[in-house]
């Protein structure tokens, strides 16, 4: 090999290689492959620089014949091949005159045209693996990397190859020739196998033994060991690589990766149309409770008994009448349904023993409200095979709705504190192991912050209603059962309270599949006058049913009491998830925990106590048109909980789609904020995917509006 090197390379290059090996204490008689590699690398560096000049106008030109009259400056400063002291002197001088950032490792060249240092690599392995080892070693955005291989492949930072095609072809041809010459002498295999990876000086967390073997076994194809894969991942430069791969896949695919800049994203377009309406399964901020404190009546805990007891606390009932009709419904039927509930409750009270459940008489108004006999007749598919024009019935496209202010008000209310405690300390699961002392502490702090939150009331209300409805749907399939909407809580003083929000009457419920629908009519008490925001109550018929005396600063005032009535429906799978709404507590607790973990890892100690007890510190809660909203840690807990609860209450395909698609845009924006220079292709397609989810759902529209606020402030 030594003889081949002396024959094959220019004597000046051989001499420089000898000096370099001597400087590093290596014997070229033994390390002959290393000797050949150094010579090859030097030659590539010189060829890279050859014939490239900068003229008087500062333009880069190629001059192959020496013209003594031309006032030309070499485009590249060659650093490789100088002894270390001299090389660093050159680097320092370049940094001082050009303002370039000083590299940690000695680079090979400096490009006066592009004003950057260049690291040249020549590899006998795959270019991308070697590229990534180089990138991982030098860890500098400023140094440009250009790798050549003996097979004619190359790879460069951001697919920017610096030189023209012809100059690079000269280098590739020379490398190919060296390879053939070596092969003809039987030297190539030994040379190819002798290449070691770039040695970095930093310490690495070593994996040994079984874990190491498992790691090596589970690598993607084409990676021989974990180190190669690590290097590949650490320095992967995706943009040019993805473009190349896509164009190989198909001629039709043309993914031009565009840089994503602060000016690139536009706001998400929200739909126009009438304002969106309330679509939750039960009233939220508008609900009114009839309550009993310290219940101790006979049959306490039996829903029907509790409901009757709560109804007796109110004395302001009056002859009901419709104050806001439902545009598409038969409003007298809603009125008759409420009157029937009152009458049948009265009947129960007149009985000697109150029954545990109450099935309503199947009157015409309830049959209409519950859609009895309205479903089209089901026909077996086999009986229809011969019908030539069999088709699914046409359904209308949903009408586009615009964002309305009521949904933001609902969310704000859900974050507020009530005057009752809705969960006990042990509501969020028990400790499983002694290690969880910190977990217990976090859970207790978190519970204290959210136990009085209105979102927590919604959880308990949702769990109760869904459990009761699913039980009744299975136990009384054919009956129109009356189900009280009840919740339980404690006052701040610790007294127990039972609350009645209204009633549900369920329809026939032969639920075979998870998605089979059970219809129900909900009747809920409220003090909200529906005429203030009629668009919110589009799906409701609202009755005035009584007058309530309320204590106020000026004494007692009488307010009309309303009943919000609507037909609704749900399914087994929706009720199953509704019963598990307590998961929202866990989800938001985990989000808070990750904030504490981040803080703890910075301070290198557990910060749970400080996190919850330092009342003066504020944390980011969310975006609004005013900017980033901040609040106490308790407010953060309650806001995260409210978001999780609303995701459950307003769950829909629109929300699923919006969350998945907008997340992609969010990640790109965050990458831009972190100065990672993200690139995108088909950004228009992503916007389309996001915007096709914005139809009429109030919670999705609100999230889209928040996202726009985030975009505005994130890209300032």
Curated annotation (Swiss-Prot):
Description of post-translational modifications: Phosphorylated on serines and threonines by host kinases, including human casein kinase II.
Binding site for Mn(2+) 2: 80, 108
Motif (Nuclear localization signal 2 (NLS2)): 184-247
EC class of the enzyme, as a word: hydrolase
Keyword Transmembrane helix part of the UniProt annotation: no
Keyword tags: Cap snatching, Endonuclease, Eukaryotic host gene expression shutoff by virus, Eukaryotic host transcription shutoff by virus, Host cytoplasm, Host gene expression shutoff by virus, Host nucleus, Host-virus interaction, Hydrolase, Inhibition of host RNA polymerase II by virus, Manganese, Metal-binding, Nuclease, Phosphoprotein
Protein's UniProt keywords contain Mitochondrion: no
Record GO terms (molecular function): endonuclease activity; metal ion binding; RNA binding
Name of this protein: Polymerase acidic protein
Native source organism of the sequence: Influenza A virus (strain A/Leningrad/134/1957 H2N2)
Gene assigned in the entry: PA
